[in-house]
Amino acid sequence: SAISSGWDKIQVVDYKQAQQYMDHIFLMSYDFKGAWSNDTLGHQAGLYAPAWNPKETYTTDFGVKYLLAQGVNPKKIVVGVAMYGRGWTGVNGYKDGNPFTGVATGPVKGTWQDGVVDYREIANEIAQGKWEYHYDKVAQAPYVFRKETGDLITYD
């Protein structure tokens, strides 16, 4: 079964009991943040909480630990990744050069839909110099940013 890494989703199911009926539990370690919120920006697929929000619970690490605390066999947990990014445009009002501390005006122009960008498109545009690449060493999460437009994409 594929499940969200969000603790609020995990808590409503007794996975210690449910695991007996499952070969694996595919933990979706993505879609933590996105353009559905323009005032709460963050990593779409952070492994750990970022330094600017150390109490963030929407992380892969938190999801795995939450399942283990329920008594799930670690051999049943398979961490899934997305091959796309989520992003915003018009990011402004941020502090210390960190766009995630600001707010956005809407979703970034996407590949399939606004706010969602295919990984290949991100990689190709990085190679063409269209993005400023960054890596959050604390959260273990990459992102790209264009200061001129406030376009921000977080991906895994």
Regions found by a protein language model. Name each.
Residues 33-46, 81-156:
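Glycan-binding loop/region signatures in secreted carbohydrate-active enzymes
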Residues 16-21, 70-74, 136-138:
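Extracellular/periplasmic catalytic domains that process cell-envelope and extracellular macromolecules
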Residues 15, 19-22, 57-64, 119:
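Extracytoplasmic/secreted envelope proteins and their assembly/folding machinery
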Residues 25, 79:
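Conserved, mostly hydrophobic/aromatic
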Residues 6-18:
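Distinct, well-ordered alpha-helical segments
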Residues 2-6, 30, 82-86:
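Active-site beta-loop-alpha junctions enriched in small/polar residues
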Residues 35-77:
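P-loop/Walker A phosphate-binding loop and immediately adjacent motor/lid segment at beta-alpha junctions
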Residues 1-7, 74-77:
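Short beta-strand/loop segments at the ligand-binding rim of alpha/beta enzyme cores
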